[in-house]
Swiss-Prot record:
Keywords: Cytoplasm, Kinase, Magnesium, Metal-binding, Phosphotransferase system, Sugar transport, Transferase, Transport. It comes from Borreliella burgdorferi (strain ATCC 35210 / DSM 4680 / CIP 102532 / B31). GO terms for biological process: phosphoenolpyruvate-dependent sugar phosphotransferase system. The lineage of its organism: Bacteria, Pseudomonadati, Spirochaetota, Spirochaetia, Spirochaetales. The gene is ptsI. SUPFAM superfamilies: Enzyme I of the PEP:sugar phosphotransferase system HPr-binding (sub)domain (SSF47831), Phosphoenolpyruvate/pyruvate domain (SSF51621), Phosphohistidine domain (SSF52009). GO terms for cellular component: cytoplasm. Its cofactor is Mg(2+). This is Phosphoenolpyruvate-protein phosphotransferase. Signal peptide: none annotated. Phosphoenolpyruvate binds at residues 297, 334, 456-457, 467.
Length: 573
């Protein structure tokens, strides 16, 4: 029996199915409790909190031993959420005023938080909902007495679950985990990131296919072909064991490139940087030997608690990342990118019919001046401790330069008045992700020190396509000549003005996309850390002239199919 799925991490794995089921919504009682039970339920909640914090501290230690110091940050963040006073207030209010049980009150308290995050269009932010579900499930399982222990597993397994959370993976000896199958998640999900870090295959499948797999089923995950073979024959097992051996050899070759420069066959240097979303991701940065951070998303700081982060909290986070990256390249910090589709509950954004065209990112800064100024202050304070740059999202019109200058100047005045040191020459740049900004890039280059092109949003704005809409997904094409010509214009304008221009969208970490961008003239790309070794491997196979010829063909392509055929012939496997 063969099942299909969507690949989120390449590779091949063979093992027995081990299912993790979490259907708490189906087993928690919705019945009202008697008034006499209120104190007892509050006590259950408080005891569950204490046990959860104890367990999370233990997971911190395990994570540090298994993955290094930075990985423990996932569980440090979860402890902060469990300890949050506002969570206490929400749960206790539901117990006291609504007379719900502790378990159901916890479920409801997290439900709105989870839904608000799942509504995000940004895939990275959307998938942070798994952290909230992880905490919710832990608290409820403690109250219901359903805490599972998988620490004694000592055979090769494939983890199968509706959604993989950070805690799930820490319950296992990962030497025995050979792959992941989930019903929820994308390329930025915990399952995907962990799988790529470990070099394991992972697929997202339909819930019905997930349910068709039972504990003990022997399966093969072929994430190269995006299939799962249930109960494979001995011939199929032999075939895939051979493929796994060849895969191991290729991995060795890729990791031999870790400390070498990324360059073309004829020696043209290309800087490969990392996109990260939390300090935890520094683990992967170090593993793959990237040359700086091209995009440090800061939204996690605003999502890990039920209240906004303080200036000091942000400063400490930025400082830690900068010091960890010392001598490994510049850290580019993107200021807050929320609004519309990226709602944060305590900011009270109104629902909009067109969130992608609405009140978001730079457009909301003046209305939330105190919040944004605290971030600029924190970034400027951190600039004293290493080489960083600050990048503002979604600049649309030239006049918005004044908004950027307002916060920059206020940060400098504020820090000077407090006697705090900072880098007077801190570079300020912007994301180019709106066509209007791309079209005036020559003018913007006179005011800013660098551009970073966000190809994901730019593509859907240029083509007027919602990439999440399956009915028109065929129109979303990151290789479309109209998109590429606009990207090329921004590069040329930046180079003419003497400023740095890089790409931080998914195009830069895509095999064909990276080669194409270098052919267009880019010498700086930012991507998920695990993509860098593969890109290094590919770059050294081609000369600049060959890549320029490829780019020229794609720029003049008449169809998506024609473009893909060029890539197939050029790259092969």
């Amino acid at each position: 029996m063969t099942l299909s799925g969507k690949r989120i991490s390449k590779g091949i794995g063979i093992g027995e199915v081990l299912c993790i089921r979490k259907n708490f919504d189906k087993i928690i009682s919705r019945e009202k409790i008697d008034f006499s039970q209120v104190d007892s339920e509050i006590s259950k909640f408080n005891k569950a909190k204490s046990k959860a914090i104890e367990a999370l501290r233990d997971l911190e230690r395990k994570a540090m031993l298994q993955f290094g110091d930075d990985k423990k940050g996932i569980f440090e963040g979860q402890v902060l959420i469990v300890e949050d006073d506002e969570l206490d207030e929400l749960v206790i209010e539901l117990i006291v005023k609504e007379n719900y049980s502790a378990a159901y009150s916890i479920y409801l308290a997290f439900e709105n938080l989870v839904k608000s995050v799942e509504d995000y269009k940004d895939p990275y932010l959307k998938e942070r909902a798994s952290d909230y579900k992880d905490i919710r499930n832990r608290l409820i399982s403690i109250i219901l007495g359903q805490v599972s222990d998988f620490s004694e597993i000592n055979k090769d397994i494939i983890l199968v679950t509706e959604e993989l959370t950070p805690s799930d993976t820490m319950q296992f000896d990962l030497n025995y985990v050979k792959g992941f199958l989930t019903a929820v998640g994308g390329e930025t999900s915990h399952a995907a990131i962990l799988a790529r870090t470990m070099g394991l295959p992972a697929l997202v499948m339909t819930l019905s296919d997930i349910d068709a797999l039972k504990d003990g089923d022997k399966i093969v995950i072929d994430a190269m072909s995006s299939i799962v073979i249930k109960n494979p024959s001995s011939d199929e097992i032999n075939l895939y064991e051979g493929k796994i051996l060849r895969q191991v050899e290729l991995e060795k070759e890729l990791f031999s490139l870790k400390d070498k420069d990324a360059e073309t066959k004829d020696g043209t240097k290309v800087f490969l940087k990392a996109n990260i979303g939390t300090p935890v991701d520094i683990t992967y940065v170090n593993k793959y030997g990237v040359e700086g951070i091209g995009l440090f998303r800061t939204e996690f700081l605003y999502m890990r608690s039920l209240q906004p982060p303080t200036e000091d909290e942000q400063f400490e986070t930025y400082k830690r990342v900068i010091e960890t990256m010392e001598k490994k390249g510049v850290v580019t910090i993107r200021t807050l990118d929320v609004g519309g589709d990226k709602e944060i509950p305590y900011l009270n954004f109104k629902k909009e019919e067109n969130p992608f065209l609405g009140f978001r990112a730079l457009r909301m800064y003046k209305e939330y001046e105190e919040l944004i100024q605290a971030q600029f202050n924190a970034i400027f304070r951190a600039s004293h401790y290493g080489k960083i740059r600050v990048m503002v999202p979604m600049l649309t019109i030239y006049e918005e330069i004044e908004t950027i200058e307002y916060f920059v100047n206020n940060a400098k005045i504020n820090l000077k008045s407090r006697g705090l040191p900072f880098d007077e020459n801190l570079e300020v740049g912007c994301m180019i992700e709106v066509p209007s900004a791309a079209l005036i890039s020559s003018k913007l280059a006179n005011k800013l020190k660098f551009f970073s092109i966000g190809t994901n949003d730019l593509t859907q704005y240029v083509l007027a396509v919602d990439r999440g809409n399956q009915k028109i997904s065929n129109l979303y094409d990151k290789y479309n000549p109209a998109v590429l010509k606009l990207i090329k214009k921004v590069l040329d304008d930046g180079v003419s003005s003497g400023i740095d221009v890089s790409v931080c969208g998914e195009l830069g970490g895509d095999d064909a996309g990276a080669l194409l961008l270098v052919g267009l003239g880019f010498r700086s790309l930012s991507m998920i850390p695990s993509a860098t070794l593969r890109i290094k491997y590919l770059l050294k196979k081609y000369t600049i002239m060959e890549l320029e010829e490829l780019a020229n063909k794609v720029l003049n392509s008449d169809s998506k199919q024609e473009t893909l055929s060029y890539f197939d012939k050029f790259i092969g496997d």
